[in-house]
Design a protein with these regions (language model features):
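N-terminal signal-anchor module of multipass membrane proteins
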Residues: 1-70, 77-106
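Interfacial segments of multi-pass membrane proteins
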Residues: 83-90, 244, 387-402, 407-413
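Short, non-helical or kinked segments that cap or interrupt transmembrane helices
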Residues: 45-50, 67-81, 138-147, 252-257, ...
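Membrane-embedded helical hairpins/re-entrant loop segments and their flanking transmembrane helices
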Residues: 10-12, 16-18, 41-62, 322-399
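Membrane-embedded alpha-helical modules
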Residues: 6, 107-273, 404-518
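Hydrophobic, membrane-embedded alpha-helices of multi-pass small-molecule transporters
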Residues: 19-35, 224-236, 254-255, 268-270, ...
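Intrinsically disordered, low-complexity non-transmembrane regions of multi-pass membrane transporters
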Residues: 1-23, 172-221, 278-306, 340-361, ...
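Juxtamembrane helix-boundary/capping and inter-helix hinge elements in multi-pass membrane proteins
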Residues: 42-45, 88-95, 102-106, 131-134, ...
């Protein structure tokens, strides 16, 4: 038995046997699938094309980085506002989607593609700057007291998504009913002919009737607004935690896959005993799979994704390109997270992997992958923190596994039943996994602070961390993820990172003089 087998882990340059490789890859695909598909559904891009693009970009990323960085490239939420606000005549893309069943026509996707391709230049430029300036320059601009809390808010800003997925419609229904009841109560108090004009009174009464009608359409007794949805999500969560902690050997490296299987099993039992009204399994909208380059028969088994060519649009470049800046602090935090977790495992073998020094390759790879995804008709993206969490949990850091995950995603995108099966996994199951994964991303931020020895008794460090955490979380939960700053929509994470860099710079003035005085 090899030392690797005893430790039950795989380092970046190690390749599992074929059977294990495929299962590890499938686990990574399941982890990336929800976010990547949701981005496609929100932006109106074709689902199969988006999944194919993420797989293709991941495969290319492996070659671009010399097979040294185990990362999965998936669609990024950072670009949603920019793409949705693009104009098609008098309408925005979001408004067009409401008239086309939620899918953008190919000619509009091609406009967005042009902006996405150019956005890749931003990450490439950042990578070249890092290569020119060296690691010391990067650590001065993005020290651990910046990258650590940035990693933390990446995970914590996703906490709301995890809970809303864990109880998908229960949250929405309860919130809608509470808001509706409150609004009707307020309207009833205001709608008094003695205090308002007849016109205003009529308008308020009409609005009250509309709200009442809408409330009548809210489901009363389905699995989605019952406690059973929590049973599924919590079963998934606890099964995953138990498998991660107590399973040994090969099975101990598949806790997310096994946890998802348990969650699906619980959802299946609820459906079997409760009937159709207790069905948590999902169906992907047919419109999301309608377009294809070529179909076998009616496309119900095999259909090549629909690829579109970009159309020149400088408006798309102006809208999309600046958003790429938001992904740079994320990518930097991700590479430091990965470096810490890989080397924590590598030192048990007497090895060392200097992954942090590959930040330039990582950023350049991200930029080229944006171009590749945009060229075939996929959204812009970034490397996924949830896939890093999966590696940290399973201790499978193998580059061949991520390469295989990319190939697997491309294959799945061509087989309609595969997409339907993976998409059909109940949202509550995904939410159960996300509670663990997104929390793990935040925990990795703490690990960066500990590993780099950041003193929490240093007033500068406390100030930088405090500003990043408060701004990032505050903007995410109060302003919905973006804050308008002189007409520019600044994403929460990017804004927090930039603010943290500025605060760190200002509070570092005079540090060298102070050190010299002490010496």
């Amino acid at each position: 038995m090899t030392k690797r087998n005893i430790l039950n882990s795989y380092l970046p340059d190690e390749k599992p046997t074929t059977g294990k490789l495929l299962l590890y890859a499938l686990q990574q695909v399941i982890v990336m699938f929800p976010a990547t598909v949701i981005v496609a559904l929100i932006t109106g891009f074709q689902v199969s094309t988006t999944v194919f693009a993420s797989g293709l970009a991941t495969v290319c990323f492996t070659f671009i980085t010399g097979g040294k960085i185990p990362m999965y490239y998936g669609s990024s939420f950072a670009y949603l506002t920019a793409i949705g606000s693009l104009k098609a005549g008098e309408l925005t893309f979001n408004e067009v989607m409401r008239t086309t069943g939620g899918i953008l026509p190919p000619e509009l996707i091609s406009i967005a593609q042009f902006g996405i391709i150019f956005s890749g230049l931003v990450s490439i430029a950042a990578g070249l700057l890092v290569r020119w300036g060296g690691k010391n320059m990067v650590e001065k601009i993005l020290p651990a007291q910046v990258t650590g809390p940035v990693a933390m808010i990446i995970g914590l800003t996703l906490a709301g998504n995890a809970i809303s997925d864990a109880a998908p419609a229960a949250v929405a229904v309860n919130n809608l009913k509470s808001a509706g009841d409150a609004l009707i109560s307020q309207l009833s108090a205001i709608a008094d002919p003695a205090t308002v004009s007849a016109t205003v009174n009529s308008a308020l009464t009409s609005l009250g009737d509309t709200v009442t009608s809408a409330m009548a359409a809210v489901p009363e007794a389905t699995v989605f607004n019952s406690n059973w949805v929590w049973v599924v999500s919590l079963s998934t969560l606890f099964a995953t935690l138990i498998f991660s902690r107590y399973l040994k050997g090969f099975l101990g490296q598949l806790p997310l896959l096994l946890g998802a299987a348990v969650g699906c099993g619980v959802a299946g039992l609820i459906y079997a005993f409760g009937g159709p009204e207790m069905n948590l399994f999902r169906s992907i909208p047919e419109a999301a799979l309608s377009a294809s380059a070529w179909k076998l028969g009616d496309g119900s088994i095999f259909a090549l994704p629909a690829f579109t060519l970009p159309t020149v649009s400088w408006a798309a470049v102006a809208a999309v390109m600046p958003i790429a800046i938001a992904t740079i602090p994320e990518s930097t935090a991700h590479i430091y997270q990965l470096d810490i977790y890989v080397n924590n495992e590598a030192k048990k073998r007497g090895k060392h992997y200097d992954i942090a020094s590959l930040l330039d390759r990582n950023l350049i790879g991200d930029g080229i992958c944006d171009m590749i995804s945009g060229a075939v008709g996929g959204p812009a993206g970034t490397n996924y923190g949830e896939n890093i969490s999966t590696m940290a949990i399973t201790k499978v850091f193998s580059v061949p596994v991520m390469f295989a995950a990319g190939i697997l995603a491309m294959v799945i995108s061509c087989f309609t039943p595969f997409i339907k099966v993976i998409f059909g996994i109940p949202q509550a199951v995904i939410g159960g996994l996300e509670i663990y994964l997104f929390g793990a991303i935040a925990a990795q931020g703490i690990a960066i602070l500990i590993e780099k020895g950041v003193s929490m008794f240093d007033s500068k460090n406390v100030a930088v961390i405090a500003v990043i955490m408060t701004f990032g979380l505050g903007v995410n939960y109060f302003f919905g993820g973006n804050i308008n700053f002189f007409g520019i929509n600044v994403p929460a994470i990017a804004g927090a990172a930039i603010l943290g860099i500025v605060v760190n710079f200002l509070l570092s003035i005079g540090d060298k003089k102070t050190e010299a005085a002490h010496n």
